[in-house]
C-alpha cells in the first residue's frame, strides 16, 4: 500500500513541479467554470439576460488539459467532456420537464381557472424552474432515484390545488352554537323548547304543583339525564358528544334552573285561593311526614296538604321519608324545605312534623308540644279544635301534649 502510494504514476508530472503548478491552475479553472456555470443558471432562470458567451463556454473548457487523476481528486468541472455532458443534460432535462408540464397542464383535472392562475403566479413558475435545475444536478452522477423535488414529483405535487374542495366543518366546530341555542330555549320555557324540536317536560303550573308529588333533587337530575338521552336531536348538523367541561356547565345550569323553579313554585302557588273542605271522618293514625304545601291562607294550606297526603302514598315508596326506630331521619325534597305550613310561620327546614287528622295541615312536633317518642294516633290542630268542636268528640279527650 505504501509502495503503491510512493511510486509516481507515469501520467503524473514530476514531483518538483506538482506543488508549484497544479494548485494555481486548479483554482483558476474551478473559479472560472463555476462563475460561468452560475451565469448560465441565472440566465436560464431569467434573473439576468442571456449573454453571448454561453455558446463559447463549452469550447473554453476544452482548452484545459486532460488529467488522468483518480476520481477522488477530480472535480465535476475538470474535463471538457464532463462540461459538455453537464450542459447537454441541463438543456435536455429542462426541455423535457417543460414539455411534460405543458402536456400535464391542460389534461389534469384542476380547480376553476381563477384559482389556478392565482396559484401559478410568475414567482411560483421561476421557483419551479429552480427546483427542477437542482434536481437535475442531483441526478447527474448517481442512479436516477425519484427525489422529493424531481420533476415528476413536482407535477404530482402541483396537483393538490385540484383537491381543494370545500371541506365540511368538523363536528366540534358545529357543536357549540346549537348547544347555546338549546340552553337558551331551555331557559325560555317549554314553548321555545318545543319550537326547537326538543321534547321537554313542562314547568309545573300552580294547580299542577299541588297535585304532583315532590321529587328529590337527585332524582330530578337522574330524570333530566334520562330525558336528555331520549330527546330528539335538534334539526341541522350533528352535534359532537359533550366534553367534560360542557357537562359541568350543563350541571351548573341545571342547578340554576332548579333554583328558578323553586322560586316559581314557592312564590307562584301562594296567591291561589281554595275553598275550605267539609269536615271528614277521622283518618288512620298520622305518621310524621316532612312534606307540606306552599304558604297561602289557612284554607289553601289545608286543601293542599290533603291532596299531598293522597298523592304521598305513591311518593313514600320512592323514599321521601324514613322513620328509623324512634329517631326520625328526614330527607327533604328540593322545594319542600322552605315551605311554611305550621302556624309558627317558620319553614319546614327538615324538622319533624305531624299531620292534622281533620284538615291535613302539617305542624311541627315542637309547636304541637309532642315528643318524638310519644306521637299520638290522632292529632287535631288548634284551628280545628276552635272551629269544629266535634273534633274533640271524634278524637276523644285531647291529648296532654296538645296546645
UniProtKB/Swiss-Prot annotation:
Q: Where is the composition biased (Basic residues)?
A: 92-101, 177-187, 213-225
What are the boundaries of the region Disordered? 1-30, 50-123, 139-321
Known tissue expression = Widely expressed in human tissues and various cell lines.
Q: What cellular component GO annotations does this protein have?
A: cytosol; nucleoplasm; nucleus
Q: What SMART domains is this protein classified in?
A: PHD
Q: Print the keywords alphabetically.
A: Acetylation, Autophagy, Chromosomal rearrangement, Cytoplasm, Metal-binding, Nucleus, Phosphoprotein, Ubl conjugation pathway, Zinc, Zinc-finger
Instruction: Give start-end positions of each zinc finger (PHD-type).
Output: 339-387
Composition bias (Low complexity) maps to: 147-161
Composition bias, kind Acidic residues: at what positions? 245-262
Q: Which domain of life is it from?
A: Eukaryota
Which cysteine pairs are joined by S-S bonds? none
The UniProt record lists the keyword Transmembrane: no
Positions marked as site (Breakpoint for translocation to form NUP98-PHF23 oncogene): 120-121
Its GO biological process annotations read: autophagy; negative regulation of autophagosome assembly; negative regulation of autophagosome maturation; positive regulation of protein ubiquitination
Query: What is its biological role?
Result: Acts as a negative regulator of autophagy, through promoting ubiquitination and degradation of LRSAM1, an E3 ubiquitin ligase that promotes autophagy in response to starvation or infecting bacteria.
- Would you identify the family this protein belongs to, as annotated? Belongs to the PHF23 family.
Note on domains (UniProt)? The PHD-type zinc-finger domain is required for interaction with LRSAM1 and negative regulation of autophagy.
Provide the protein name. PHD finger protein 23
Which organism's genome codes for this protein? Homo sapiens
The gene behind this protein is PHF23
